[in-house]
């Protein structure tokens, strides 16, 4: 190997190639993206931002006094909306927002994952393909976006399109 020039040596002094820092905790996004077949990495980060905003709102509401009518009203509204979106289970509490609201909770409400849970498909990857090809409708509308968010009320209306050959089988 040739002798390094001055500016090359100067750049390499800032890096230690023998002992580099391992990023063991930064693989959560890759695992979630792979498990739920999220095609764009930006979707994961958008969900992460939403979770952060909701945690901030829940934290500010928890700091209010329990006798405050404004705080109680907004706590009920927040918990009601999260329950209707099926991000929280039955009888949610404000502590559930901090403990159970994750990016995976948002990903579990995506249309392909709901289809797998309803036994319409065996795997999430096949259900993503079916959604992209226009074989699935929610109510009267045909959905071609796999990132479609299915709420608790819309879950009953997820069916195959009438002209779909998959429905005939």
From Swiss-Prot:
<dbReference type="InterPro" id="IPR002942">
    <property type="entry name" value="S4_RNA-bd"/>
</dbReference>
<dbReference type="Pfam" id="PF01479">
    <property type="entry name" value="S4"/>
</dbReference>
<comment type="function">
    <text>Component of the U3 small nucleolar ribonucleoprotein. Required for the early cleavages at sites A0, A1 and A2 during 18S ribosomal pre-RNA processing.</text>
</comment>
<comment type="subunit">
    <text>Component of a heterotrimeric complex containing imp3, imp4 and mpp10.</text>
</comment>
<dbReference type="GO" id="GO:0030515">
    <property type="term" value="F:snoRNA binding"/>
</dbReference>
<dbReference type="GO" id="GO:0019843">
    <property type="term" value="F:rRNA binding"/>
</dbReference>
<dbReference type="GO" id="GO:0006364">
    <property type="term" value="P:rRNA processing"/>
</dbReference>
<keyword id="KW-0694">RNA-binding</keyword>
<dbReference type="InterPro" id="IPR001912">
    <property type="entry name" value="Ribosomal_uS4_N"/>
</dbReference>
<keyword id="KW-0687">Ribonucleoprotein</keyword>
<feature type="domain" description="S4 RNA-binding">
    <location>
        <begin position="109"/>
        <end position="166"/>
    </location>
</feature>
<dbReference type="InterPro" id="IPR036986">
    <property type="entry name" value="S4_RNA-bd_sf"/>
</dbReference>
<dbReference type="InterPro" id="IPR022801">
    <property type="entry name" value="Ribosomal_uS4"/>
</dbReference>
<dbReference type="GO" id="GO:0034457">
    <property type="term" value="C:Mpp10 complex"/>
</dbReference>
<protein>
    <recommendedName>
        <fullName>U3 small nucleolar ribonucleoprotein protein imp3</fullName>
    </recommendedName>
</protein>
<dbReference type="GO" id="GO:0032040">
    <property type="term" value="C:small-subunit processome"/>
</dbReference>
<keyword id="KW-0699">rRNA-binding</keyword>
<comment type="similarity">
    <text>Belongs to the universal ribosomal protein uS4 family.</text>
</comment>
<dbReference type="Pfam" id="PF00163">
    <property type="entry name" value="Ribosomal_S4"/>
</dbReference>
<keyword id="KW-0539">Nucleus</keyword>
<keyword id="KW-0690">Ribosome biogenesis</keyword>
<dbReference type="GO" id="GO:0042274">
    <property type="term" value="P:ribosomal small subunit biogenesis"/>
</dbReference>
């Amino acid at each position: 190997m040739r002798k390094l020039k001055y500016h090359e040596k100067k750049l390499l002094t800032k890096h230690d190639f023998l002992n580099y820092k391992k990023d063991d905790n930064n693989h959560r996004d890759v695992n979630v993206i792979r498990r739920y077949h999220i095609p764009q990495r930006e979707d994961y980060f958008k969900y992460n931002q939403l979770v952060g905003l909701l945690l901030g709102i829940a934290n500010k509401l928890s700091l209010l006094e329990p006798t405050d009518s404004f705080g109680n009203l907004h706590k009920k509204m927040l918990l009601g909306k999260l329950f209707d979106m099926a991000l929280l289970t039955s009888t949610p509490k404000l502590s559930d927002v901090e403990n159970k609201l994750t990016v995976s909770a948002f990903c579990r409400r995506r249309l392909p994952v709901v289809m797998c849970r309803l036994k319409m498909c065996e795997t999430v990857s096949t259900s993503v393909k079916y959604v992209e090809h226009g074989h699935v409708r929610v109510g009267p509308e045909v959905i071609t976006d796999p990132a479609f968010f299915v709420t608790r009320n819309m879950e009953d209306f997820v069916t195959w399109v009438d002209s779909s050959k998959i429905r005939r089988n």
